[in-house]
Amino acid sequence: MLKNLRETMRTAPIVRRGTYNYFIHPISDGVPVVKPELLREVIACMVKNADLDVDKIVTIEAMGLPLGAALSTMTDIPFIIIRKRKYELPGEIAVHQTTGYSRGELYLNGINKGDRVLIIDDVISTGGTMKAVIKALEKAGAVIKDIVVVIERGDGKKSIEELGYDVQTLIKIDVDENGVKILGCIDEECQ
């Protein structure tokens, strides 16, 4: 099922940022080009595996935008974008996030107490962003029904599971200076 995702991961360029081997991929970076067949495949896999008995889909700017829009369109479930910009709307919640290579503020709007939500994102590495998002959703009184992330790298998934939440990832990878190695994926035809 994830033929395009597997192939594009295997051929993803690697750049060095300090001591960090950063992979460049259409799902996580939007470059060089996001092909519709790749996005369609990823969203179809999310539809097949995610708990869609929710009121809202929650995703994180920037690369969560195409995922959220496509999944919302396919399921008719509204989506919320956690933004990098403050809007100062009533009830806005600041989300302080720290990742393996950045930190900053994000802002959550549009969540009501009792909303059942599905969180989706492009990558989980350290889990820093996801922890911050979970904390903000809990503060807003949302019920987190499921978390689905396209690409798993590092121990971030484990750190979220230690908080009591399951995280489904479509593909698990490791990255070194030689490239991306696929360690597993949600479908049976991974390798």
From Swiss-Prot:
It comes from the Archaea. The keyword Acyltransferase does not apply. GO terms for biological process: IMP salvage; purine ribonucleoside salvage. GO terms for cellular component: cytoplasm. This is Hypoxanthine/guanine phosphoribosyltransferase. It comes from Methanocella paludicola (strain DSM 17711 / JCM 13418 / NBRC 101707 / SANAE). Its main location: cytoplasm. Its EC number is 2.4.2.8. It is found in: Cytoplasm. Belongs to the purine/pyrimidine phosphoribosyltransferase family. Archaeal HPRT subfamily.
